[in-house]
Amino acid sequence: IYSTILFTEFMERKLNIIDCPGSDDFCGSLFSAFKVGDVGVMVFNAQNGWEVGSEIQARYSRELSKPLIGVINQLDAEKANFEGTVESIRAASRVKPVIVQYPVNQGPGFNAFIDVLMMKLYRFKDENGTREELDIPAEEMERATELNRELVEMAAENDEALMELYFEKGTLTQDDIRSGLKIGLSRREVMPLFCTSGKRDVGTKRLMEFIINVAPGPLKAPKFLSTEGEEIAADETQPAVAFVFKSQ
């Protein structure tokens, strides 16, 4: 019923995590977590889509100007519905969602998805997150190419230089796409969507890779207000300032 503070080290980086209660009855701690976090990871149940708790999370992130990454979880459930979940997000969210990954075999056998940023198929061999990277099969190439184009256009829209580059070359590199998504995330104009099965450890590492490489850090965070109403920005050259929050 309370938030839990934990961390993990991955790709030579430390990720600080505030795990908030999943029940709507204990959503009060969400506000404190959003207050100190750099980015919110909004987890959707693939069977239910956008729910009441989703609206609460979206409102808090909006009030505190914090970016959101969407994760469609439980894709291994019998009634998992990726497309329906995406449509419910599009209908309810004020931040435009963009698909980064989509499942190829949702349901009880779910163990693979296509990543349209990397343009690869990832298949997971076991429940320890062990994966193999494969070429996209011919029957999925048309859909993957279309979603990649949408991702490229979304990235280009966030930066004039990237837009000019897109018009000139007709596409963007993976680094260019990441750069555009980072800008869009910082402005809260885009919510990238990922596929996972937390129970089977499917997609977790790719999500963490994206957070490390693309999600905006504290230097891009909105300025805090001191008790005197003074704006305080993240600046290592200025005197140290502490912000205390409670997790219980």
Enumerate the language-model features and the residues they cover:
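Structural and coupling elements of P-loop NTPases
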Residues: 1-248
